[in-house]
């Protein structure tokens, strides 16, 4: 029985094909090949009109030594095809492309594989070019076609927008679930010469955002050559728990006499990629723009004898924004959450929200960043206003202008989902509890799992807020069992709040509450060392005079940090 693609990856480095577009255009397609002037340039139509061309290209790459070829579907999602007036043909064209590649792969002895190519499209979700729902359905349709046509893996490639990566991976998983066919899911970002994706994300931010999404490969392709990718491959090698792929261009392109020229000949390209594979522990290599069957033929003997890499990556558990990642455990502690972007806690924020002064709201967030906050708590709940709409509009402005990761603060499931659709990075959702049982907590956890978010959980159950050490630890245990054991979240993605009560109420029942909270912090850290904790420290002094509040807050913060 032929081994699976995953089995091959466990044995040795896997070799993919090279560029498809240049090979197609070298054949000189005409209007007749496309069918009409309006369809000119829609190369995915050649999967139907010029099947022999596409299969010949696949065959040449297999003969050059490739283990797998990518389907001719880079631009075959409905959003792209709509620009040619044929969005309804997406499924058909993806099935056709996958079947063409499948036929060629199966004609070779031994294991040869088909990788379903899913390109970035022409619209950036982060910049509001389309909606989350439209992009999700577009990718779901494309992946469904690739699966139906026999693809062995799905490759979401040449990614330029972190938000696009997240929606595409979720759509791919949905398509697999509907088809009852799970295949490896690969993601490749395109890091420009600026050192980031087109919208500004570095590769580490991408890693932290996709880490909870259950992909199998995270790598790089396009834009630059092997040399320019080195530092980004190093970052992945150090931290990524996923297999690493590298499909560079044949060097940095340059313009010579009006033509795009790639400087690396097959031998030079092969030497550089082989060096990168050995140095960074690459699992998959191949080529992108400017590479040909000759480049793959030159690369094959260098990498096909390389055993599957064995790395020991160390991933620092983090939240992330569009631009950067922030460790959940800061050194020195604590991690500071800015709360002035909260309509319940800031009059200035609430007043600006009432006026729909979005620029002022963004400036408040920028102020929190300047003052040293590590995360932003965002809450737009305001009586009489549409919270879903406000969250949508605010995050549309905020995510491109502020670097801090977001803590989404809402009790409403639709608001949380909209926020997770708008925020490109790895967010934290604030919060769940068991006040009304587990039903609502489970709905929120379902969203966090689907969108790759961490979760704040309060020590509140059906009996109310936990005031004693015993009750706090008891509810914490219940939270760990639900979030970590049942839902499968990494322990660090659970952030438990053992609750802080005011000492200014005069209520005898709360006299020892601060000590109980501190002891709960210590107990949680000791019993579940990877689980994180959080406190609303200033709650301890609520109702006291300003001078007293500062002193008590500082004292509580000091002891909270000492207790874990």
Where would I find each of the regions flagged by the language model?
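Domain-level signal for soluble alpha/beta catalytic cores
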Residues: 1-564
């Amino acid at each position: 029985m032929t081994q699976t693609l995953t089995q091959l990856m466990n044995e040795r480095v896997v070799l993919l094909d090279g560029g498809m577009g240049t090979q197609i255009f070298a054949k000189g397609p005409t209007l007749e090949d496309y069918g009409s002037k309006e369809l000119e340039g829609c190369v995915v139509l050649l999967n139907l009109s010029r099947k022999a061309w596409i299969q010949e290209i696949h065959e040449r790459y297999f003969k050059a030594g490739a283990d797998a070829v990518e389907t001719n579907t880079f631009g075959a999602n409905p959003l792209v095809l709509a620009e040619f007036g044929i969005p309804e043909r997406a499924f058909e064209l993806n099935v056709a492309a996958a079947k063409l590649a499948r036929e060629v792969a199966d004609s070779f002895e031994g294991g040869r594989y088909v990788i379903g190519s899913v390109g970035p499209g022409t619209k950036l979700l982060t910049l509001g070019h389309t909606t989350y729902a439209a992009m999700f359905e577009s990718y779901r349709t494309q992946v469904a076609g690739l699966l139906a046509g026999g693809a062995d893996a799905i490759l979401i490639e040449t990614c330029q927008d972190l938000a696009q990566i997240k929606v595409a991976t979720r759509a791919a998983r949905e398509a697999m679930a509907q088809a009852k066919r799970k295949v490896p899911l690969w993601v490749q970002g395109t890091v420009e010469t600026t050192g980031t994706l087109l919208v500004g994300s570095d590769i580490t931010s991408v890693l932290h955002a996709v880490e909870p999404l259950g992909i199998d490969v995270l790598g790089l392709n396009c834009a630059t050559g092997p040399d320019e990718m080195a530092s980004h491959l190093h970052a992945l090698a150090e931290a990524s728990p996923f297999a690493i792929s590298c499909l560079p261009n044949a060097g940095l392109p340059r313009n010579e006499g009006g033509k795009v020229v790639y400087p690396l000949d097959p031998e030079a390209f092969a030497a550089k990629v082989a060096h990168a594979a050995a140095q960074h522990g690459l699992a998959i290599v191949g080529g992108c723009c400017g590479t040909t069957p000759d480049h793959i033929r030159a690369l094959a003997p260098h990498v096909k004898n390389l055993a599957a890499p064995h790395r020991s990556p160390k991933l620092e558990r983090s939240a992330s924004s569009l631009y950067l990642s922030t460790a959940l455990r800061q050194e020195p502690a604590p991690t500071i959450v800015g709360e002035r972007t909260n309509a319940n806690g800031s009059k200035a924020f609430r007043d600006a929200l009432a006026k729909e002064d979005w620029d002022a709201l963004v400036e408040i967030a920028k102020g929190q960043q300047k003052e040293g906050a590590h995360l932003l708590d965002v809450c737009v709940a305001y009586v009489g206003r549409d919270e879903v709409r406000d969250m949508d509009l605010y995050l549309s402005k905020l995510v491109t202008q502020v670097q801090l990761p977001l803590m989404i603060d809402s009790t409403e499931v639709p608001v949380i989902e909209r926020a997770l659709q708008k925020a490109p990075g790895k967010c934290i959702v604030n919060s769940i509890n068991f006040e009304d049982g587990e039903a609502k907590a489970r709905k929120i956890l379902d969203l966090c799992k689907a969108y790759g978010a961490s979760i704040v959980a309060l020590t509140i159950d059906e009996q109310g807020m936990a005031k004693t050490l015993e009750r706090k630890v008891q509810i914490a245990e219940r939270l760990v069992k639900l979030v970590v054991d049942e839902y499968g979240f990494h322990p660090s993605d659970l952030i438990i709040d053992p609750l802080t009560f005011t000492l200014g109420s005069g209520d005898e029942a709360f006299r020892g509450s601060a000590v109980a909270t501190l002891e709960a912090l210590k107990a949680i850290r000791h019993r579940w060392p990877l689980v994180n904790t959080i406190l609303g420290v200033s709650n301890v002094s609520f109702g006291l005079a300003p001078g007293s509040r500062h002193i008590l807050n500082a004292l509580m913060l000091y002891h909270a940090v000492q207790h874990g």
